[in-house]
From Swiss-Prot:
InterPro entries: AAA+_ATPase (IPR003593), ABC_SmlMolc_Importer (IPR050093), ABC_transporter-like_ATP-bd (IPR003439), ABC_transporter-like_CS (IPR017871), Mo/tungstate-bd_C_term_dom (IPR008995), P-loop_NTPase (IPR027417), Sulph_transpt1 (IPR005666)
Oligomer and partners: The complex is composed of two ATP-binding proteins (CysA), two transmembrane proteins (CysT and CysW) and a solute-binding protein (CysP).
GO cellular component term of the entry, any: ATP-binding cassette (ABC) transporter complex
Gene Ontology molecular-function annotations: ABC-type sulfate transporter activity; ABC-type thiosulfate transporter activity; ATP binding; ATP hydrolysis activity
The name this protein goes by in its record: Sulfate/thiosulfate import ATP-binding protein CysA
Keyword Transport: yes
Membrane disposition: Peripheral membrane protein
Keywords of this entry: ATP-binding, Cell inner membrane, Cell membrane, Membrane, Nucleotide-binding, Sulfate transport, Translocase, Transport
Domain of life: Bacteria
Family: Belongs to the ABC transporter superfamily. Sulfate/tungstate importer (TC 3.A.1.6) family.
Broad EC category: translocase
Domain ABC transporter: 3-237
Enzymatic reactions: sulfate(out) + ATP + H2O = sulfate(in) + ADP + phosphate + H(+); thiosulfate(out) + ATP + H2O = thiosulfate(in) + ADP + phosphate + H(+)
Amino acid sequence: MSIEIANIKKSFGRTQVLNDISLDIPSGQMVALLGPSGSGKTTLLRIIAGLEHQTSGHIRFHGTDVSRLHARDRKVGFVFQHYALFRHMTVFDNIAFGLTVLPRRERPNAAAIKAKVTKLLEMVQLAHLADRYPAQLSGGQKQRVALARALAVEPQILLLDEPFGALDAQVRKELRRWLRQLHEELKFTSVFVTHDQEEATEVADRVVVMSQGNIEQADAPDQVWREPATRFVLEFMGEVNRLQGTIRGGQFHVGAHRWPLGYTPAYQGPVDLFLRPWEVDISRRTSLDSPLPVQVLEASPKGHYTQLVVQPLGWYNEPLTVVMHGDDAPQRGERLFVGLQHARLYNGDERIEPRDEELALAQSA
């Protein structure tokens, strides 16, 4: 079941929370709505579900306009962060509930309901807990029950609002893998809200990054990491170093050093330089690629690489985070050399585009 979100706007009083949002979700795709608090992601999810109504715009399911359709008539499964299980019902009865309240002409008979719930219990690996009550379950088990209950009525679309947000880190990881496997098996269309970047990139086919009621980027997870479409995405997704400098002529100046850009930008003046920790070239010896001296402040081994916090020596005041590969980890106080590879320059929110795809600032002028 495909979803078409067309020119959706939403206001609460004078506050505009969604600004002309358009997004197409193909049938069978799992999409993450990712963003900080206040970005509009949960409001958009609730509009898809029919729990909120847009100020203007349209929602279509497989070409059919459902914009004014009541939530109960959209055939959408919804999973909340805090489970919303019925405390007085067993696990079995919680999962069966949606089937038992269907209109009589659509309601399966008792034997069919039992068979379906039994199958779902096996699918979510909770068959041995069918007679327990929610108070007797762990957080991860409760969320599995909530997912099974949502799937019991065979929804055309599954929507999840921060489904793992209330769980501890290890349980979240296990449930993420399980949800992805379940999606691969059942091939339902799914949209979930999260503020967790790792969760979004691990589970989703496509990540929609939102900020202040706008879509900043909608791409495959690796594309969002490698090719951020805006400054917001660059800063929001993972760790990034920022250096403040100035463009003068065809050179980038930071502190007492300057680097040739290879071209002269139309914009001249203060800029911010961004680069990921793994985009910094680092070496124990000075070279054309890594001419800038730094001193190691912190070294955190991560298995096949070491994450370092280094202090530039004489060319910038703020420390940088970098990644060094190999088994021979540097020690605190050790002197290393870096180059500013794959750098991106921004004047406010506007990227200063180089002639090539990226800048490679290394040897100073």
